[in-house]
Amino acid sequence: MAPNTNSGRTKAAPRAASSRPTAVLVLSDGSLFKGRGFGAAVTNVGEVCFNTSMTGYQEIMTDPSYAGQIITFTFPHIGNVGANGKDHETGAPSALGMITRQLPTAPANWRSESSLEAWMVAHDLPGIAGVDTRALTRHIRDAGAPTGVICHNPDGVFDIDALAAQARDWPGLAGMDLAIEVTRDAEATWDEGSWDFLSATHLTTDAAHRVVAMDFGCKDNILRCLIDAGCDLSLIHI
């Protein structure tokens, strides 16, 4: 099965009532993890890594430094604040998939605009829950970040041998020009500061410094910090 090329979005079907796995994670060394799928019903291949943060999963998934990676979240309650249109670190997700211990929890936050699962479907991102994330994290720690294929199929039908071959055949991140993929495609100005919870908007400041930033995959929060510091900010791309 070929990796997702983002040529179209595939809506995830409702979860089946049976205990049959609806998603798998297959590593290049042959390790197999079965679980419950969520998000988009697609297949992606990338480098499997882990993140121990307790909050900020939307920022992490849209962080350009995670381009080409499938992220294992070690904190169990992923999804509890939902998702919104303000907390992206770039215009679109850079990560390729999500691995969790539990299915995303229902959002309970006043800034939430959608559930995490709906957000992942909208961005063509597959997820797998029910994975022993501690065991997977130890595996990554001891053996290094492996290539993996994450496949979400609501029908629960998987060609494990083909997925394992796809993982083995992926060339890996070494040598990839990821900056081209995560860089903005046009020059722009930036005037958005940090989020202010009292006014429910991004702050702006009087500019005291003229700054030109060359974008090689810059996080939006870095740019917000420059605005907070009083910079008149322009972005140029490579």
Can you say where each PLM-predicted feature lies in the sequence?
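Class I S-adenosyl-L-methionine
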Residues: 121, 224-227
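Flexible inter-domain linker/hinge segments
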Residues: 20, 140-210
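Short active-site oxyanion
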Residues: 124-127, 208-212
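Glycine-rich phosphate/diphosphate-binding loop of Rossmann-like nucleotide-binding domains
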Residues: 214-216, 220-225
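A generic structural motif
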Residues: 230-233
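Generic start-of-chain signal for non-secretory N-termini
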Residues: 1-29
